[in-house]
Amino acid sequence: TRSDGLVIGNVGGGVVANAVLGEKGVQYDLDKLPFIGSPYSATHYVFATRRELGLTNLEKLRSATGIRIGAQSVGHTNYTIGRMFAALLGLKDSKYVTGYSIPERDVALLRGEIDAIANTDDFYARNPEWIDKKLVDFHVVMEIPKGLKHPLFSNLPDIENFAKSDSARKLLSLFRLLRLTGSPFILPPATQKDRADAIKEALRKAFKDAEFVKEYRKVVGEDPTPLLPEENERAIRDLPRDPETIDLFKKFAGAGPLPSL
């Protein structure tokens, strides 16, 4: 493996998740990979119901029965966080309807084929009419990173407020930190320390450069939310990895009955 700092990798968040969750085929040691930052990290998952249901507040939502929650597929992040929202809010007899593309899911919600969705904030930035026309009621949010308020959803409670046990808090921490890592840059494990430090400093400067922000906005269509090298390393280090939390996470991501929290 090259150690001269001339090789830099950029990987999807699945590289972290697959290793932590112990998926088959992983042939790398997560703790030996130098993580040096990501151009994006912040996001907000929001739980919403269609306006026609009349579930205009949490009390009404939590007293409803048989809410149909739509998602792309079993195991998708929107599916997994939707099930976490349902469990922590104590929704009764919630159903999970999968197999949609995002446009199909949105049409299904507006037609009343499903009742609720869990979405990221960038969806509403791209589709402001959902807010302007009050097509949905918003109930709770997951802030990533924790404590980062979104201007459109700052009035919503964070889902962690409903976590009453250490196991629930660890579960949310695992989901949050897996998402926080974004699409990280990594170096070969054998990279010389002085070379790695130089690359980290270069990334810090790049992430703060006005031209980088401008170009990122032009290409991606939204502002970057950089994760600096030391923050990236901390997120990897702080990931809950105990067997109980991993098993619970897999149950929420799977097709089985909704676990209780």
Regions found by a protein language model. Name each.
Residues 1-7, 15, 19-111, 163-170, ...:
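Hinge/capping helix and adjacent helix->loop/strand transition within the periplasmic-binding protein
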Residues 143-148, 204, 208, 212-237:
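Mature extracytoplasmic/periplasmic domains
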Residues 210, 228-261:
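Extracellular/periplasmic bilobal clamshell ligand-binding domains
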Residues 4-12, 70, 114-121, 138-140:
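Paired acidic/hydrophobic, glycine-rich loop segments that form the ligand-binding mouth/hinge
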Residues 13-15, 51-53, 121-123, 144-146:
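Solvent-exposed coil/turn segments that connect beta secondary-structure elements
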Residues 1-4, 84-88, 103-118, 122-134, ...:
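Short helices/loops that flank or line small-molecule/ion binding pockets
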Residues 8, 139, 214-216, 248-249:
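Short, hydrophobic secondary-structure boundary micro-motifs
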Residues 126-207, 244, 255-261:
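C-terminal lobe and pocket-closing loops
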